Amino acid sequence: MIFMDNMKEKRKINVLFVIIHMEMGGSEHLVWDLIRNLDRSVFRPHVAWFYQEKPLQEFLDLDVPLFFIPKINRLDLSVMGELSGIIKDNEINVVNAHHYLSLVYSFYGCKLKNRSKLIYTEHSEWEVQAISGKWLFVGRRLLRYTDAVVGISSKVTKCLQDTFRLPGNKICTIVNGVDCTMFSVAHNTEQYKIKYGLERDDFVLGIVANLKKNKNHIFLLKAFQKLRQRNNNLKLLIIGQGFKGDPEGSEEDIRNFITSAGLESSALLLGGRTDVPDILKALDIFCLTSCKEGLPISLIEAMATGLPVIGTNVEGIQDVIIPHSNGYLVELNDEEQLVQALESLIEDSSLRHEFGGMSRQLAYQNYAFENCLRQYQSLFL
C-alpha cells in the first residue's frame, strides 16, 4: 500500500517554490496562496527559503515539505549545492524562483545538475533596476536558459524585458491575485471593533505591512499624531511582524516614536497575524504609506473587504489606487497631504461608502486569484 501511494505521488508534478525570507510579504503571500489552491491531484508543492529559520504557522498548516537553507555569506555557494540536492532527492520537476537572488541560487540545481523546468518570478521594478555590473551580465546568461520569466505587473515585465533583453515569447505578466472569497464587507464593524478591544465609536485606521523601513510606518504615525489632537476617538492598528537583528532597527524606531508621541493607547502594534480578514473588518480606512512596492497584496485585500484606501504615490501602489474613485494617492512623506486625505474620509461617511464599493469592485475585477492560479498552473505543466 505504501509502495502504491509513493508511485501515485511520483506521477504528480513536483513543484519547488524558492523564496528568500520566511515572512508574509507580497511574494511569500503569493506562494502561500498558490500552494493552498494548486490542484493537488496534479501538483505536489515544496518550499525552500534562506532567511528566518522558523517556518511561519501559515506555511506549517499547508502540510507540504519545507526546507530551510541558511545563507551565510553574500554569495554562499553552499546554498546552490543544498538546493541541487533538494531538487534531486525530491524529484522536483519545476522550480519557481521568486526574486533575482532565488533565481541565481536555483539555476545550478535546475539546469546544470538536474533537468528541471525553471520559472523566475520578479515582484518589483526597483529590484531589477538595482542589478548592474557583473550581476547584470550573469542575469542575461542565466535567463537565456530559464524556461519562463514572469513579471507581476506590466511595468515589472517591461523592466525585465528592457534590462535583460528578453524575447517576448519567454516573458509574461501574471498579476498577483487575491482570494477574494476570504474577504467580505463588514455590515457591522462594531462587533469586530469590540472583538479587538476597541470601543464601538472608535474610528479605526489600519496598515498591514511588515515592520521594515521601506514600509514607512513613521510617516503614517506622524499624520495620525496630528489627527489625534483633533479627534480622540481615532485608533490606528498596525499589523505586521518585526525582525530580530534588523540592521535598520525599524520596529524599535516605530515603538520609540509611539512612546515619545504618547500614542501607546491609540496606535496599537498587533504583530504578524493570521486573522487579517477579520481585523480588516474592524477598520474604517486602510492606509499603505510605503516608499516603494511591487504589487501590494495587503492593499488589494483591504479593497476586497470594501474599504476606502489611501496610499503613497509610488510604483506598485499607484497601479492599484484610482484617485477619487476608490481612495487617494498622496505624495511620499507629505504629512499635510496625508492628513487632508484622511480628514476628508473621516468626515464624510458617504464618500467612504462610495470609495469602499469601488474598491471591492476593482479587487474582484482586476485581482481575482483564479486568473493568477490558472496561469501559473499552465506554466507548471
Region annotations inferred by a language model:
Residues 12-13, 17-81, 86, 156-157, ...:
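N-terminal strand-loop element at the rim of the active site
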Residues 272, 291:
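Aromatic "clamp/platform" in nucleotide-sugar-dependent glycosyltransferases that forms part
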Residues 25-33, 203, 207, 212-226, ...:
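A conserved mid-protein helix/loop that constitutes part of the nucleotide-sugar donor-binding site
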Residues 48-49, 308-311, 321:
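Short hydrophobic beta-strand element within catalytic cores of glycosyltransferases
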Residues 97-103, 122:
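Short His-centered aromatic/hydrophobic patch
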Residues 323-324, 328-335, 344-350:
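Conserved acidic donor-binding segment of nucleotide-sugar-dependent glycosyltransferases
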Residues 194, 337, 344, 351-366, ...:
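A short, well-ordered alpha-helix in the C-terminal region of glycosyltransferases
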Residues 251-271:
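Nucleotide-activated donor-binding/catalytic signature segment of Leloir-type glycosyltransferases, i.e.
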